[in-house]
């Protein structure tokens, strides 16, 4: 890859004037109000539930609604967006560390890792990193379409899926509204995993060979949960021993919600790997052979 191309990518992902001058505010950022957030989440739950009830009442057979390759196109779009956000926030974090490191002497931040875990008190939601956090927040609403696809394809609506998607949108909003610490590492790990998972779904959606591991997607999500746990422990340590982290109240609420998601995921993971579930999957495979 040529130096000119690398410089061009770096400019458009971290040095563009709009990215550098970004500021999260109700007047400048679409979707930045509490009313928009709660209305969108309520609409998502209402539409998903209504569609599930309607299809269950109208379509008595087990046939799914034909969607063509719309889910696969959605997966490709989400994979590209996730990879772009990952690259953008990685380059932006490096640029912010380069430009603001001299200010860290006013706080107890000593290393880039400490800054990634714990924003200094008084951090404002503006600049490169928060631009990509805003883009990530908007993509949470695109992610919700997977629930619609699941209802149309199988007429199943998982309450856990509604809860997890709603929580992701809510916590992404908290990151911006309260300049919450830890969000950079959370976005990096989430977008990295999502770019792989959505790319895998796009690949297998067209009937191409899948992973040799049947639980590939679930294992990727398990890695993401593990990264979140380590990051949360790091934030708490920094807050207690380094004089406080910005947005720690929002981080506390975020931790509670992530704990609820963790319990739901572990319950699903245990049930999926139980002997009874493996026996059922084996019987279904033999029946379809």
Swiss-Prot record:
Protein name, per record: Fatty acid elongase 3-like
Membrane spanning stretches: 35-55, 75-95, 129-149, 157-176, 181-203, 205-225, 248-268
Localization terms from the record: Membrane
Lineage: Eukaryota, Viridiplantae, Streptophyta, Embryophyta, Tracheophyta
Swiss-Prot/TrEMBL keywords: Fatty acid biosynthesis, Fatty acid metabolism, Lipid biosynthesis, Lipid metabolism, Membrane, Stress response, Transferase, Transmembrane, Transmembrane helix
Predominant localisation class: membrane
InterPro entries given in the database record: ELO_fam
Gene inactivation effect: No visible phenotype under normal growth conditions, but mutant plants show decreased abscisic acid (ABA)-induced inhibition of root growth and seed dormancy, and enhanced ABA-mediated stomatal closure.
Family: Belongs to the ELO family.
Molecular function, one GO term: fatty acid elongase activity
Membrane topology annotation: Multi-pass membrane protein
Single GO biological process annotation from the record: very long-chain fatty acid biosynthetic process
Enzyme nomenclature, EC number: 2.3.1.-
Described purpose of this protein according to its UniProt entry: Probable very long-chain fatty acid (VLCFA) elongase that controls VLCFA composition and functions to inhibit abscisic acid (ABA)-mediated stress responses, including regulation of stomatal aperture, maintenance of primary root growth and inhibition of germination. VLCFA pathway and products may function as signaling components acting upstream of sphingosine-1-phosphate, ceramide and the heterotrimeric G-protein complex, in lipid-mediated regulation of abiotic stress signaling.
Organism: Arabidopsis thaliana (Mouse-ear cress)
